[in-house]
């Protein structure tokens, strides 16, 4: 017999009760679309308190209570919005957003991530637009009121990225402040020392302008604006910087370019790129919220791989942030005849155009004017994700400098030499003594091993030898992998089985 109190008043074990409560919460959230911001804030807090118990029930674990989870994030967002203040200097704005304001962005994304069906997304969207949009507009007004004194006004004001021995600059397009703060938490939990800093992006806040805004590279670039883009030109040739030329310039500055998924030998100074945050945002709009965690997990893994192979310092940098608003950012009218080039959040004005919108100078040539979309609006309708304007979300950019703790929180493995002799791989590793060494087609999957027998790393400076069992594997792409005592990969190096392109690789000084 079922105990009489099994289906008690709370209804924790009744799926029908949970469904009814989800429907009620959905209705209450959708009603916020017509509520004043103050009333919406109060209602969100009330609803969060009412539905908080359901977020711990089994139905939430099973994915049957998405709104019970989302309302908690909406409450967190509301609490930040209510304590926002009115900072009126660049320093005060930066301090507010880097320390507190970013939490509203994070909570908003988490609420969207929790609610993925059409119905629940509409409900969460109504709450976000009622509370978060007014907050965005308030701070965009505060920020744009200071536009004439913007801190980053040209190459002489931009950051410096010196070519330092053992350093990798990891560029992550669109790594906004809130995502960087979450990444910081992940990296600290991984045992890394993290120094978090922030600065101002180049204007307009688009990749074409902002990616190259660092010294000494910026000293080689300039204007004027030509065509429809915001790309700087190389002063010596007058040509726009292509990706291929960017890589050449890095080499000239003493910095190697590491392609994706390659760690290489940790010598000299390097630049690498990772992530698709900005791409997902442009392609999927508000659904970017569903991708954030996997993007950050991938970025964390890439950083740890670089540390594990022996790079002593990783500096994560970005070019710009972005605005995201489910249901679309407001529209600002800018007729085509008033703009020589019109982007979502910025434009190149036509000669003599009268439009009444905020203006700034182009980062690469102060003689060139740029129109900024007012507030958080776009010159194109229906955009849920955009950047190019002047808001804290777009313009205040983070950087993270990472290194291993002096106490040795992360074990580093360094590959010193590697050579194939037939199907036998001979190598010299540092930091791998007693750890399992393998050759696999998939780094984290031990079942994809090519090794004839399990082996462990030799002492530092001594040769470790591994035999590949299957002659038919010659020429196959694989990874040399070192794992810790828990079976977790801590080092990987792409290889080609049996290929002598990797004839004895010894570290040669390549000072930056």
Positions of predicted regions on the chain:
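…; additionally, a secondary subgroup of soluble metalloenzymes is captured
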Residues: 1-167, 174-512
């Amino acid at each position: 017999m079922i105990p009489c109190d099994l289906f008690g008043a709370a209804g924790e074990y009744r799926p029908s009760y949970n469904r009814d409560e989800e429907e009620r919460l959905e209705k209450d959230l959708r009603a916020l679309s017509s509520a004043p911001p103050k009333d919406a804030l109060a209602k969100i807090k009330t609803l969060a308190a009412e539905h908080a118990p359901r977020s711990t029930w089994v139905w939430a674990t099973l994915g049957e209570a998405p709104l019970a989870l989302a309302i908690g994030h909406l409450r967190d967002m509301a609490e930040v919005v209510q304590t926002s203040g009115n900072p009126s200097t660049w320093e005060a704005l930066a301090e507010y957003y880097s320390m507190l304001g970013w939490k509203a962005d994070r909570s908003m994304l988490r609420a969207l991530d929790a609610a993925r069906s059409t119905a629940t997304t509409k409900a969460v969207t109504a709450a976000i637009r009622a509370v978060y949009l007014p907050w965005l507009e308030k701070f965009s007004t505060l920020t744009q009121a200071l536009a004439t004194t913007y801190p980053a006004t040209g190459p002489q004001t931009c950051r410096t990225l010196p070519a330092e021995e053992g350093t990798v600059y990891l560029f992550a397009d669109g790594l906004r402040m809130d995502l960087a703060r979450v990444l910081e938490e992940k990296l600290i939990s991984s045992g890394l020392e993290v120094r978090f800093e922030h600065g101002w992006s180049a204007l307009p806040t688009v990749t074409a302008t902002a990616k190259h805004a660092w010294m000494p590279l910026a000293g080689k670039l300039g204007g004027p604006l030509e065509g429809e883009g915001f790309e700087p030109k190389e002063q010596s040739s007058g040509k726009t910087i292509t990706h291929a030329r960017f890589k050449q310039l890095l080499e000239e500055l003493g910095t190697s370019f590491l392609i994706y998924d390659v760690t290489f030998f940790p010598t000299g100074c390097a630049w690498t790129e990772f992530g698709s945050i900005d791409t997902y945002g442009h392609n999927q709009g508000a659904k970017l919220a569903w991708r954030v965690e996997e993007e950050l997990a991938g970025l964390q893994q890439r950083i740890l791989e670089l540390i594990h192979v022996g790079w002593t310092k990783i500096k994560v940098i970005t070019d710009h942030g972005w605005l995201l608003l489910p249901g679309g950012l407001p529209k600002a009218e800018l007729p085509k005849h008033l703009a020589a080039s019109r982007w979502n959040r910025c434009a190149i004005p036509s000669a003599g155009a009268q439009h009444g919108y905020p203006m700034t100078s182009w980062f690469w040539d102060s003689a060139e004017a740029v129109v900024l979309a007012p507030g958080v609006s776009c010159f194109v309708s229906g955009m849920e994700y955009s950047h190019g304007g002047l808001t804290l979300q777009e313009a205040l950019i983070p950087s993270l400098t990472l290194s291993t703790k002096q106490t040795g929180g992360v074990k580093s493995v360094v590959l010193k030499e590697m050579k194939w002799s037939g199907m036998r791989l001979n190598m010299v590793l540092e930091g791998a003594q007693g750890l399992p060494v393998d050759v696999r087609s998939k780094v984290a999957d031990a079942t994809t091993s090519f090794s004839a027998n399990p082996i462990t790393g030799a002492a530092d400076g001594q040769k470790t030898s591994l035999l590949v069992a299957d002659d038919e594997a010659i020429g196959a792409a694989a990874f040399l992998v070192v794992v810790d005592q828990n079976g977790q990969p801590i080092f990987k190096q792409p290889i080609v089985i049996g290929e002598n392109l990797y004839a004895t690789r010894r570290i040669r000084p390549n000072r930056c």
